[in-house]
Amino acid sequence: SECLVGSEMCIRDRNTVVVISADHMGEGDEELGKVLIKGFIYALTEQDVLPQTILFYNGGAKLTCEESPTLEDLKSLEAQGVEILTCGTCLNHYGLTDKLQVGSVTNMYVIAEKMTQVGNIVKP
């Protein structure tokens, strides 16, 4: 689908979902991983074709909450029509239920549905 944001056109790929399960990217040094995940989410904002949905679960749920270094970029993606969904069980586990700052709360049924009904799952 397409949308107009300001004077720019954004295109969302209905067949792509990004899944983020940690507040860092990759294995090894966790601080480096936090820099990498921030860079990955920023890079998504610069793509010509945006994913339809970004799913956050487990430690990834922290990225959609207060004090996350990725909030500005996630809000930009949401403003361009990307659906941002965070696991409610995960927010509760980390004590972040009241700290969600972008997107909406979802459940594992919806996460499973989104992941099984698309052709492309991107997991950084």
Where are these regions (language model features)?
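Short amphipathic alpha-helical segments and helix-helix/interface helices
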Residues: I41, L71-K75, A112
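Single conserved hydrophobic/aromatic residue that forms the stacking wall/gate
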Residues: S1-I11
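C-terminal structural segments of small proteins and small subunits
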Residues: D98-Q117, V122-K123
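Short, glycine-/small-residue-enriched flexible loop/hinge segments at domain edges that mediate gating
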Residues: E46-K62
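Short, glycine-rich nucleotide/cofactor-binding loops
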Residues: V17-I37, G59-E66
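A glycine-rich helix N-cap at a beta->alpha junction
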Residues: T70-L96
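Fold-independent oxyanion-binding glycine-rich loops
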Residues: I20-D23, Y57-G60, C87-C90, P124
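Histidine-anchored nucleotide/phosphate-binding helix
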Residues: L32-V49
